[in-house]
Curated annotation (Swiss-Prot):
Pathway(s) served: Lipid metabolism; phospholipid metabolism
Gene encoding the protein: mboat7
The protein, known as: Membrane-bound acylglycerophosphatidylinositol O-acyltransferase mboat7
EC category name: transferase
Region (Disordered) location: 447-467
Pfam families: MBOAT
Length: 467
């Protein structure tokens, strides 16, 4: 493990026991202590680069104060343009930010855009209440516009400051105002989330030592046979998953220990978004709680869901919620594959400027189009047994597609990514294009069958009338 990874691990490990202490604090003390601890972590790991995140926060606050109506669009433009400056600071003679500063900046970008949307919703709903004299039906809406102190406290809250998960300002405010945090579940769900982390960590270390990523860039790698080169991406994606499984499960445990994102099960919370329905518990029955709001990874479904599009739902779930609510609806396209492509383009930009991100993320819409074509033209014609076989083949190809795309994500450079993909003959791209072509061909045949069947039925009807 690199020194940076050890620092991440140390911060993650420390936040879990610290979280339990926060349950004993009153709301004002909890807010101040969480801010202080977050600032200590930020300054200790980022130093002077903490100013980047502070500029982002202050800029968003100014936008909200000046024009809350247009704040969502303006904050998105501001934070994403600042990301560009942040990544090109060396062009202006400024020092390169640390990886820790980059992690904080990424999560802060999501928080600021979400905050602007929440404030806009608050003002719009308040106007409706005044004009209609009725209570707003919005679930989990703000009760007041956050002050500058509130915004800074939310931005630098120590929980998930570098590792996520993303959570809305309302989730943060609900955490501060919990009436009896000591009575909420903590130890058991925390241990439940941590129980597989040692396994993930050991698998990460073991497989990474046998299949190092750096070997892919060597000339010796290309001397191996095709099947070895193909299998290597399977191992690399396995290492990638184990790394993030362990990190995100640990980050979720840090939220759970502090009680952040704890809501009654009846609230039907969504990862990242929080409650989706208003919930009034029955005073005569025990209330059961969950931490769905801060769930960032579903390890089982990531591995065993069938479709490429479903795989995205279970990976980095809170960020997927953010993309689905703030980017996907505003895409300048109507077709699902094109809207997904737009969303993936924005996601790639959020991750960074390396070409490998774009090559990987923009392969996803192609795979989605391929699986959609095959489902409509092939799976729909099969019986239950045939569909079961189809789904297993689909799952296998889904995993290989993510293996393939992961290589661009970790190799980063366009030359390295294309060099590897060419060494396995761009197999996933070719399979996807073939699937789309087969789907279109069979779709055309199905239309001809329907047309011929319809013409035959018309001829039979005419013949019956003549007789």
């Amino acid at each position: 493990m690199s020194p940076d990874e050890l620092v991440y691990l140390g911060i993650l490990a420390a936040t879990i026991p610290v979280g339990f202490l926060f349950r004993y604090l009153s709301p004002p003390v909890k807010q101040g202590a969480a801010l202080l601890l977050g600032l200590i972590i930020s300054i200790a790991t980022c130093g002077i680069h903490t100013l980047h995140s502070l500029c982002t926060v202050l800029g968003t606050w100014i936008i909200i104060k000046i024009n809350w109506r247009s704040a969502p669009a303006l904050s998105l433009a501001w934070t994403f343009l600042y990301l560009l400056f942040f990544r090109l600071v060396t062009w202006f003679g400024l020092p390169q930010p640390t990886p820790f500063a980059n992690a904080i900046q990424l999560l802060l970008t999501l928080k600021m855009v979400s905050l602007a949307n929440e404030v806009q919703s608050y003002h719009l709903e308040r106007k409706k209440e005044v004009s209609t004299f009725t209570k707003s039906p919005v679930v989990a809406g703000l009760s007041h516009e956050p002050s500058l102190y509130d915004i800074i406290s939310y931005s630098y809250c120590y929980v998930g400051i570098m590792t996520g998960p993303f959570f809305r300002y309302q989730t943060y405010a609900d955490w501060l105002q919990q009436s009896s945090p000591l009575s909420l579940p903590g130890k058991e769900p925390c241990l439940q989330r941590l129980k597989m982390v040692p396994v993930y960590g050991l698998l990460f270390i073991a497989v990474n030592s046998v299949f190092p990523l750096s070997y892919v860039r060597t000339e010796d790698f290309l001397e191996h046979n095709y099947f070895y080169r193909f299998f290597y991406m399977v191992a690399i994606f396995f290492v990638f998953r184990m790394r993030f499984y362990s990190a995100w499960c640990g980050a979720e445990a840090g939220c759970i220990s502090a009680g952040l994102g704890c809501y009654p099960q009846g609230a039907l919370s969504k990862p990242g978004g929080g409650p989706t329905v208003k919930y009034s518990p029955d005073p005569e029955t025990a209330v059961e709680y969950d931490f769905k709001t801060i769930q960032n990874i579903d390890c089982y479904n990531t591995d065993f869901c069938v479709k490429v599009r479903h795989g995205m739902r279970y990976w980095n779930m809170t960020v997927q919620w953010w993309l689905h609510h703030y980017i996907y609806p505003n895409a300048p396209f109507r077709a699902y594959a094109l809207r997904a492509g737009w969303t993936m383009l924005i996601s790639a930009y959020w991750h960074g400027l390396h070409a490998g991100y774009y090559l990987s993320f923009l392969t996803i819409p192609l795979c989605i189009a391929a699986e959609t074509a095959m489902e409509a033209s092939v799976r729909a014609r099969l019986g239950p047994a045939g569909q079961n076989i189809f789904d297993w083949i689909h799952w296998f190809l889904k995993m290989r597609a993510y293996d393939y795309m992961c290589m661009g994500f970790v190799l980063l450079k366009a030359s390295d990514t294309i060099s590897y993909w060419s060494s396995i003959y761009f197999v996933i791209h070719i399979i996807a294009i073939v699937c789309i072509a087969v789907g279109q061909f069979m779709k055309g045949g199905r239309k001809r069958e329907k047309r011929e069947r319809g013409e035959g039925e018309k001829e039979d009807a005419v013949r019956e009338k003549a007789e």
